[in-house]
């Protein structure tokens, strides 16, 4: 009998509708039947209270048509909207139009070399370019650019070192050669903030950030605190690199940073094709596959322009 009464109640209310189009019988719950007495609740969240009272009266009239019912009790309920967690405002980097991350799932894939190549090529295309070496634990940008000096400061701001029109900053400028940097995540993240926001950039079109490998504190700090325009992911053909890159892709997708493309470095030496697989699986453009070239390593060691050896189709992706 209880089931029959529940169906009768729902059926009786099916033609009572709120002005916003909500059917009354779709927002009732907690139907209780005790003998000939019934009760239920109506969720009036976001509804006009006067209209709700009018529809409640209509509901009672309709239910009184069921002869078995003696007493009707209807209560209103209202769910509180979930409070949105206040989002911390993200920083813009002064005098920088676009920020592009260059990232990888693991170390040793040539990420810093690719970062330098991207910066050098954009500079040759007459863009104003800067590069930040955010690989706190293994800074190699100073070596690639042949920089052995410490940046100057002015009015409390760091002046980046300019090499062939590219403005360069790195934690490597501030530590002794071969010294280990032993910092926990918060200290490393604070240092990245100083490299980005305390540096006095001179009207950049692009700021390229050479990220540390992995998906740690520095990555989260960057994604949560700065307005970023996209990330280029560097991989190598081996399966082990592909596995680690998938974690990076997952991070950037979850935090809604556009993945501009994948660059596969050290290509054609191995049977596997990590860059191609990832491109197809995640529908991410494969920007380039760069073969192993001894000349590239030699150019990095001698701080020679990488653009003399190869170029990337950047205009299609940035």
Curated annotation (Swiss-Prot):
Gene Ontology biological process terms, A to Z: iron-sulfur cluster assembly
Binding site for ATP: 105-112
PROSITE patterns reported in the protein's UniProt record: MRP (PS01215)
GO molecular function list: 4 iron, 4 sulfur cluster binding; ATP binding; ATP hydrolysis activity; ATP-dependent FeS chaperone activity; metal ion binding
Entry keyword set: ATP-binding, Hydrolase, Iron, Iron-sulfur, Metal-binding, Nucleotide-binding
InterPro entries: Mrp-like_CS, Mrp/NBP35_ATP-bd, NUBPL-like, P-loop_NTPase, YlxH/NBP35
A Pfam family annotated for this UniProt entry: ParA
Function noted in UniProt: Binds and transfers iron-sulfur (Fe-S) clusters to target apoproteins. Can hydrolyze ATP.
Assembly information from the UniProt record: Homodimer.
PANTHER family, sorted: IRON-SULFUR PROTEIN NUBPL
Family listed: Belongs to the Mrp/NBP35 ATP-binding proteins family.
Name of the protein in its database record: Iron-sulfur cluster carrier protein
Organism annotation: Rickettsia felis (strain ATCC VR-1525 / URRWXCal2) (Rickettsia azadi)
């Amino acid at each position: 009998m209880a089931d029959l009464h529940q169906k009768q109640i729902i059926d009786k209310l099916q033609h009572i509708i709120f002005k916003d189009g909500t059917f009354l019988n779709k927002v009732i719950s907690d139907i209780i039947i005790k003998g000939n007495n019934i009760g239920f609740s109506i969720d009036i969240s976001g509804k006009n209270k006067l209209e709700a009272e009018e529809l409640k009266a209509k509901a009672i009239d309709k239910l009184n048509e069921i002869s078995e019912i003696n007493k009707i009790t209807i209560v209103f309920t209202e769910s509180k909207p979930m409070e949105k967690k206040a989002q911390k405002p993200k920083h813009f980097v002064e005098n920088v139009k676009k920020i592009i991350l260059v990232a990888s799932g693991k170390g040793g894939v040539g990420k810093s070399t690719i970062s330098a190549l991207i910066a050098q090529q954009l500079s040759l295309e007459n863009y104003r370019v800067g590069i930040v070496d955010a690989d706190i634990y293994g800074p190699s940008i100073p070596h690639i650019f042949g920089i052995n000096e410490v940046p100057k400061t002015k009015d409390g701001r760091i002046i980046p070192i300019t090499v062939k029109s590219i403005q360069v900053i790195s934690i490597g400028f501030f530590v002794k050669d071969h010294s280990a940097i032993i910092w926990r995540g918060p200290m490393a993240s604070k240092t990245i903030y100083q490299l980005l926001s305390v540096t006095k950039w001179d009207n950049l079109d692009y700021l390229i950030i050479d990220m540390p490998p992995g998906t740690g504190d520095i990555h989260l700090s960057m994604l949560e605190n700065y307005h970023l325009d996209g990330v280029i992911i560097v991989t190598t053909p081996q399966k082990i690199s592909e596995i680690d890159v998938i974690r990076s892709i997952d991070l950037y997708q979850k935090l809604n940073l556009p993945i501009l493309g994948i660059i596969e470095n050290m290509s054609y030496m191995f049977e596997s094709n990590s860059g191609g697989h990832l491109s197809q699986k995640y529908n991410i453009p494969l920007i380039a596959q760069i073969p192993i070239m001894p000349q590239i390593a030699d150019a990095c060691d001698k701080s020679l322009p990488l653009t003399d050896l190869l170029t990337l189709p950047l205009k299609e992706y940035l």
